Amino acid sequence: MIRHIVFFTVKPENVEKVRAGLSILTEIPAATRLEIGANVKTDGFHRSIDLVVYGEFEDEAALAAYKAHPLYEESIRRVKPLRDERSAADYVVEDAVTTRV
């Protein structure tokens, strides 16, 4: 399984528009789980993430199918002009450290 996590920073006046643009992604069938969440900002750092996309995919082929879907491109078209920054990470769950090393 692959986890796909994307963080967005957004001006306050654009948060709901970006969330709506990201919500399009939930209609792509390639993900086994896909969530769009707003950061509750309990960390206390000055620069905080505003929105998060969290996805789970069976394998790299499923993630590639997700990124190749026309709705993925539509989401980018809507979100990119409104977001400030975007950071993403993908990792294989079976390779993740789950105990002290």
Regions found by a protein language model. Name each.
Residues M1-L51, E58-A68, Y91-V101:
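Short S/T/G/P-rich N-terminal loop/turn motif that feeds into the first structured element of a domain
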Residues A68, E73-E74:
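Long, contiguous binding/interaction regions
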